[in-house]
Design a protein with these regions (language model features):
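Flexible, glycine/charged-enriched surface loops at secondary-structure junctions
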Residues: 23-31, 46-49, 258-262
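A glycine-rich phosphate/pyrophosphate-binding beta-strand-loop-alpha-helix module
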Residues: 94, 98, 102-142
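General beta-strand structural signal in soluble alpha/beta enzymes
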Residues: 82-84, 111-116, 137-141, 166, ...
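Internal helical hairpin/lid segments
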Residues: 225-262
Length: 262
């Protein structure tokens, strides 16, 4: 098996300089570079350098305001709501995590809602901030439609990340970092580029409803990008367990969230 090594410090340096060159403040660029490098340390490369394209394309499309700053719009002793103001999720989620940690330190527990932000990369980074303070934490959000309801032919559901971490004394933490659907656009691009099947028959043909693991007929590259691909097939959620967790996360991130968008 081929082993690859990389210099995380150079990666952070390069990402920071790229985002600042695009117009970001230094603190904004620090958050982006830190989270992308963290995903590489974790071994989740699709949530690392590749996911930079997600905020770059949002910037190019005018969906991301690189000079906007997230702000707290409501709060109480154990809760808060942060409006991302169309900034990146990297900045917004760091603010949310820091606020939750600060409130939990005095109250024992806290929940912070957020919204109106763009991609945030690996959510593992934000729960790990709590672990560094000897706290347990959960973090998630909903996404653009990447999965179909049971029996559906078109994507209506998100593919939410779910990260949780619990300190374990002098041992490694109990740590979960999963997706609550079967695949992301990065999995489609990886399969297309390397001409390999997905790990399951999760593609739903929008006309026939047939299932497939072959992305060839459905995947289409977006000019100028490598990791972000269009896919004309819908995504299947394979088990009722994953489906139920997907619905639970949607309720938490979009329905009870004061500024959530289902």
């Amino acid at each position: 098996m081929e082993t690859r090594s990389e210099n995380i410090y150079f990666l952070e340096y390069a990402i920071k300089r790229m985002w600042m060159a695009a117009g970001a403040t230094e603190i904004h660029a620090d958050y982006v570079a830190d989270a992308i490098a963290f995903a590489h340390k974790q071994g989740k490369l699709n949530q690392g350098l590749g996911v930079y394209e997600a905020i770059d394309i949002a910037l190019e499309m005018g969906l991301l305001d690189i000079q906007s700053e997230p702000q707290v719009i409501a709060e109480g002793p154990t809760w808060a709501t942060v409006d991302g103001n169309k900034s990146s999720g990297y900045w917004c989620l760091n603010m949310m995590a820091d606020l939750a940690i600060e409130k939990a330190r005095t109250q024992g527990i806290a929940i912070v809602f957020g919204g109106n932000h763009n991609d945030a990369g690996s959510f593992a980074r934000y729960v790990y901030k709590a672990f560094e303070q000897d706290m347990m934490a959960f973090s998630s959000n909903n996404t653009v439609p990447l999965a179909a309801p049971f029996g559906g032919l078109h994507n209506k559901l998100s593919c939410p990340p779910f990260d949780a971490i619990v300190p374990a004394g002098d041992k490694s933490p109990i740590w979960a970092s999963v997706a609550l659907a079967e695949f992301y656009d990065a999995d489609v691009s990886e399969a297309a580029i390397h001409k390999k099947p997905l790990k399951g028959k999760w593609l739903i043909d929008p006309e026939s409803g047939d299932l497939s693991d072959d992305v060839t007929a459905y995947a289409k590259p977006i000019e100028g990008y490598g990791r972000v691909w269009d896919c004309s097939a819908a995504g299947q959620i394979e088990t009722p367990r994953t489906y139920a967790l997907n619905m639970w996360t949607e309720a938490m991130t979009a329905i009870i969230n004061p500024i959530g968008i289902p």
